[in-house]
Amino acid sequence: MAGAAALRRSARRVVLPGAYALSRALQHPERLLSSQASPDRGGVLGSELGLYPPERVRNFSIIAHVDHGKSTLADRLLELTGTIKKGHGQPQYLDKLQVERERGITVKAQTATMFYRHANNQLPASDQPDAPSYLLNLIDTPGHVDFSYEVSRSLAACQGALLVVDAAQGVQAQTIANFYLAFESNLSIIPVINKIDQPTADPDNVKAQLKRLFDIDPSEALLTSAKTGQGLSQVLPAVIERIPSPPGKCDSPVRMLLLDSYYDEYKGVICHVAVVDGALHKGDKIASAATGRTYEVLDVGIMHPELTPTGVLYTGQVGYVISGMRSTKEARIGDTLHQAKSIVEPLPGFKPARHMVFSGLYPADGSDFDALSHAIEKLTCNDASVSVTKETSTALGMGFRCGFLGLLHMDVFHQRLEQEHGAQVISTIPTVPYIFEYGDGSKVQVENPAALASNPGKRIAACWEPTVIATIIIPSEYVGPVIMLCSERRGEQQEYTFIDAQRALLKYRLPLREIIVDFYNELKSITSGYATFDYEDSEYQQSDLVKMDILLNGQPVDAMATIVHNQKAQRVGRELVDKLKKFIERQMFEITIQAAVGSKVIARETLSAMRKNVLAKCYGGDITRKKKLLEKQKEGKKRMKRVGSVDIPQEAFHELLKVSNSK
């Protein structure tokens, strides 16, 4: 008992000089959370969090275009507050996944709690021992449009955002998209012009762009270099002074916004939450507004920067909750978690994931189906936004039809399957969700072209396809080729302006079908790599669409069926059969490759059979002997063609992906 009393006195002494000391204590929570001095409802560390009322809490995010220095800036802020050590040896600390580090993007939202003493910059810190300490929650969100719903939910937990812009590259397409996401969320936006140490940096030009595009006062911009540390000392004071504290009612029943979740093999589902009202304690009973299920809080704490148990979270604070959820499908992003058996109003904005791109995944080797099934099951434990249903293809066997939020989401999922689980898969042509209306007035949403039966008795009266609003920023000399590319992809121009003397901004409404494979690659090619591209979901529009089947020896290959615009059907069909002819190996029998719309064949190629010279041993003699041998060979090849199967190599499917959306 004497030891416990001494520990409590020691803990109180830590607090006396100011809450700044908590940051050091939190880096070694085991010193405070011993079995003797840690009551179930938070212990010493939990009571320290109580020193931070909402007025001394700031929740903010960092938003930027790819490679503008967002992750490096986050690292420097974590170092500046002592949350991680300088030279920690792990750049991009908050990017945990290998795919995030390789691509320089954020896929999973991460949070980090920092403690910062805000002193008067006009006076030396030694003269301000009682300067107030603030709790700062950095919520690192994905930046790509595929994850826009997750971003909107994460931004809903923030009151401000740092808008990072490269001092040399200036405003890019994703900068614009992210600004409007933050603007529509009513966040206080602090512009940060980064990389001012670069030889080509032009901060004044970037300030002018911010003024022209977003009406941001140039004097509000902070000039920094996350690499050298120049100007970083002004960032956190600006966060405290310009970003408001989180609203909330401390004396109300607990209400939390679920930001993200991931699965841990030992702890189950770990949820990142922002406490909007009340306080959450270990042992509390909570319920989900979306599912109605009830859970017991097994553990609660903050990310500092790793899981740090505190036993309690107060109003305005951001942290993690472990409550015994068995699957991330129970933890729906944007859901409201609240005190069980209490009537609370759910936080606005929750909606289920909307899948915009669908693709079939099949094992490269049919015997690996169980291994692929296990890999997808484990991966979806950490990505509940993927929809998975089993399907069977006559050409590829057993597989899965997966729905994704967008192109990048699909690409990242494939990469994680390969890197984290070693799965080798065949992907079918990506499709988007179409809506077809039949003559009798019934409507159906089609995600798999093979499911659209060519039924002559059920006439298709109308078709609708999803569209996007694409934002393209390019050097002005490439405007002509880009306009031509967008026109070829059935685009409608919405906006055409000049950002400055050298760069133009184009906005087009484009069918999602036209950009899901190679649009970005072709855009980069015709602009010598200078274009930046981003898009946001728009409405459905009526279109003239047809289903195209690929037939091998008269038999349709369901995995190769696709839906195309009627005007492009013949050209796309011609390119598909040409590609297949190059990649399908010759057999002992002739192979007919056809592209058909309904009962009409619009393109055809013939792969001739390999032929054995059956006359090699006939030296002269009666001609009827030679004819007999040739007729026998001909009959044998007919029989082989009738019962033989055509092997389609994996490379053929990869090539079809490139053709299906080519210009």
From Swiss-Prot:
Domain of life of the organism encoding this protein: Eukaryota
InterPro entries assigned to the protein according to its UniProt record, in alphabetical order: EF-4, EFG_III/V, EFG_V-like, EFTu-like_2, G_TR_CS, LepA_C_sf, LepA_CTD, LepA_IV
Record carries keyword Magnesium: no
GO molecular function, one term: mitochondrial ribosome binding
DNA damage is among the record's keywords: no
Example GO BP: translation
Substrates-to-products reaction catalysed: GTP + H2O = GDP + phosphate + H(+)
Bilayer disposition of the protein: Peripheral membrane protein
Enzyme class: hydrolase
Keywords: GTP-binding, Hydrolase, Membrane, Mitochondrion, Mitochondrion inner membrane, Nucleotide-binding, Protein biosynthesis, Transit peptide
Family of this protein: Belongs to the TRAFAC class translation factor GTPase superfamily. Classic translation factor GTPase family. LepA subfamily.
Record HAMAP family: LepA
Name this protein carries in UniProt: Translation factor GUF1 homolog, mitochondrial
Species per Swiss-Prot/TrEMBL record: Oryza sativa subsp. japonica
Lineage start: Eukaryota, Viridiplantae, Streptophyta, Embryophyta, Tracheophyta
